[in-house]
């Protein structure tokens, strides 16, 4: 309690001048109405005019009122006519239930009787007849009025106390006790709503009996002359009903029917009936005072009261209760998984919603009362002092409520804080918020188990390792901020699972995942021959987090994030043939962002992969990557993601399989790790917590460099890549884009992919497949093989030396058209796609036209082969072209195909060719749909998932 009051005192201190200024203004208004209260004002008098005649059928029963007053110690005074006239000049004693005179507070018996006879007032508080039959009811009403006045009139010296710098802690304590008592009474009043007399008596008793309120006069001078009952008994009833309804809505144990009724009551009594009640009472007051109550006057009063009531304030409260309800429903699942944080959030929303509902209902009624009384006072000299009095009082009460509201919010937040600390104590010091991430992960695992169990089949791997990054959770962030435990919260947590033969395995003994040190070790493959490592969600960069909570303002705090970063992920593979898709591993860190969220300064996390044995596949991500393929046939793919064109120059490499890959990633959006701020509010307190998460951020262009060792094949990007091979045997796949591929020396396998590519085999026996697009193919020296398929487009082949072959792998030889065009041989398939072999006839024509010409080069392809192994030699082509005057007749091609000797020769040669092409069958293309290197299409972008095996002849 001491800490709580100290916090309240601290919060009040900074508002000292504001409160003092407001209370001074209030005091000036109250002074005009309360001059007669400087001495003897605490005396209460039941005033009965000597000549007053009352109706025993409808009224209170004067005898009961007098008897009750005498028993309660209220002075009963009968005055002569002259005394009545004198009283009328002092704040309209006769015109109001309560009036102020130099002798004290006067309770007017006639006006009390008249008020209780009003139909509309009676509807709000119960029938006048039921309330006033007999001594007990009269005593209840009078004692309630007496106790309320006794409490509020105790506070007459607040200005003086402030000027003397009285104890702030005492002031805060009194304000808190007052507010808590009001709310407690409202909550209890729902059970005693049968009679207004009981309500007002309870309220008065509660206020009077609260510890410290007997001396409230030392602190609350601004309440001098407070005339609660003169504001209208029915208004208090409406206020209690409306606030009670809000509390019922917040009660999780209330029945559905009761909540429905309470919701109706909140909407209609607070926003509707208060307007009617205030307006009705003010009109009654004017009638009693002999003032006009015509339609225009009534409309003015009603409209003024309506403007003072804001349904939007109650809509915000309803949102809190709705949020609490949704949180409770959401929490059920995670509670079963060992985490109750969402229920704690719901508890907070219910608690603060109840406080908001109570305070808002009180303030709404006060605003309506002040507005209505001011409207009624227009043009009335008699009522003007009352309007001033009411305005001052409502302002003081609203100020006290707002100050106390923050303290009550903090009380609810403290309970949440204590429950979290107690849980951690009872669970061996485990982090409560980390436990929340564990529960979120388990729920996600349950939801996706069917999909995960099918991954072995879908990815064609005996073992699947699934790594899941649980990222920042807003509910966990809210709870950390509300409980002031933001220093303990994490940005997220990474988890690993293993699946074999459709079964979920415990991965802790199979895989080492250490996010703090940057280690991913999947080398313990057991009996599994193939495995696929799948990063289901973007994996944050490695390192450890530390947080520090700092106060930046009166109610403002920020929990700063400090990261001890590790500069790389180290991945270790074993003997299995493994596939790693690293495109979901975050490597780019946005250190600085501009106001639009664009990354202006970055840091990079490297990936170092040691693959070991097996035929491995690695899909490279957005940052620097070092790969040691080890043993086996290893491929490095750049075909997923949009991470810039490749430039590879291996002409100076001294080891086979070693490459330096340079990339320039143009400006655009890419996956980055960035730091953001989560904000949680506890009333006026604002808690900001920094956290890191992954996001596609716009960035400027950047360069990155990869180092590859012991890699057998490289698959390019969708951009215009440049490949320059080594003196060893290289395997390049251009992928999409207009690629330039130079095999250099060695027996190379070169595949263009989509796009109009330029491919040069260089020296050596090369395998060249242009792929789709109009490609320029050059074999260079050596015995080269070219491949063309239907749909590949129009290719141009230049060949010089060696025993070369051209395979139409899906066309029958007899379905092709051979013709001479200028110096070139043009072969057309059934799709009218052409393969032009440049300068096929040039040397022969030179020999015909130039005397003694000696051929210096051979631009012909020695064998052209159909899909079934049938073939035609360059010599046969020359003979048949000449025989057909520049074109081979269809019948001649048929003869070639049907010739037994040629077929026999074709079968023998076909076996050799098949072996050669088969050796290239590991080629992959991001666009060839014939042989799919499986990827979980439900987890990946479909446009990136069709990574293909080689296209065999």
From Swiss-Prot:
PANTHER family, alphabetized: S-LAYER PROTEIN
Family: Belongs to the RTX prokaryotic toxin (TC 1.C.11) family.
Post-translational modification as stated in the protein's UniProt record: Acylated by LktC. The toxin only becomes active when modified.
Primary location: secreted
Transmembrane segments: 230-250, 297-317, 359-379, 381-401
Miscellaneous section: The lktCABD operon has a complex mosaic structure that has been derived by extensive inter- and intraspecies horizontal DNA transfer and intragenic recombination events.
Species in which this protein is naturally found: Mannheimia haemolytica (Pasteurella haemolytica)
Name listed for the protein in its UniProt record: Leukotoxin
Gene from which the chain derives: lktA
Hemolysin-type calcium-binding repeat start and end residues: 715-732, 733-750, 751-768, 769-786, 789-806
Cellular location(s): Secreted; Host cell membrane
GO biological process: killing of cells of another organism
Membrane-topology annotation of the record: Multi-pass membrane protein
Free-text domain note: The transmembrane domains are believed to be involved in pore formation in target cells. The Gly-rich region is probably involved in calcium binding, which is required for target cell-binding and cytolytic activity.
Single annotated GO MF: calcium ion binding
InterPro entries: Hemolysin-typ_Ca-bd_CS, Hemolysn_Ca-bd, RTX_C, RTX_pore_form, RTX_toxin/Mannuronan_C5-epim, RTX_toxin_determinant-A, Serralysin-like_metalloprot_C
